Amino acid sequence: TGTDLYHDIAGNQAAQHSLDLAKRLIVLQPYGIHALPDEYQKKTVTVLQSAKPPAVLLKPLKHNFEVTVVGNLRAVKDPFRTAMASRLLPDDSRIVVTHIGAALTPSMNTRANREEQINHRYTWRGSLAQNLTLKAIARSRLLVVSSKMEGGANVISEAIVAGTPVLSTHISGSLGMLGKDYPGYFPIGDTVALAELLLQAETDTTFYKQLRDHCLKRAQRFNPAA
């Protein structure tokens, strides 16, 4: 996981011992290899997580520009960053935020319910079955990954194969999947920068096409047959 790769290995002796014992290590995107100490890199391979688009693709919402966030509500995911950014949008923006994921603590549950009450753009759907989640991603105009760290988020591959562009924090796990030249990055925790990207994607068709075309070019990498 991202926490293992980008946090625990550096100071966790048990994690380091596991690396010593392993004959082969797998990371989920190519940048992950460089997060490992030099002595482990030679026995490390990259395996991208594959994904299949849903069998039935739903049409995007007609009157709203739907943005989806997928992931359980944990601090490392910075789960309310997109909701916070949506509050900064101008009144005439059609952006709405659909949030899919379970609240793993009572405080996260309270925060999600409170956000729904104060933010008319935000809807929290809780945990959904995988097929429903994939349909929601495919219906969306954008997927946002706001995590502080990721080993290689499978939701990115699910969005890419569904033809849904991604906005992501500028983190190694996303750089390895989307490429360093992808135009849809924002700094960790930067609500204003995310709001600006959201509005640009909604209002600038050229920018949105750049995001979409870039993702479509990478879709074959996540084909199960690849």
Protein language model regions, located:
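Conserved acidic donor-binding segment of nucleotide-sugar-dependent glycosyltransferases
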Residues: 180-191, 200-205
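A short, active-site helix/loop in glycosyltransferases that binds the activated sugar's phosphate group
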Residues: 21-44, 51-56
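Conserved donor-binding/catalytic core segment of Leloir-type glycosyltransferases
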Residues: 58-90, 97-100
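Aromatic "clamp/platform" in nucleotide-sugar-dependent glycosyltransferases that forms part
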Residues: 148
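Short alpha-helical donor nucleotide-sugar binding micro-motif in glycosyltransferases
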Residues: 19, 127-128, 135-140
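A charged, aromatic-enriched C-terminal amphipathic alpha-helix characteristic of glycosyltransferases
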Residues: 203-226
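Short hydrophobic beta-strand element within catalytic cores of glycosyltransferases
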Residues: 165-168
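Nucleotide-activated donor-binding/catalytic signature segment of Leloir-type glycosyltransferases, i.e.
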Residues: 110-131
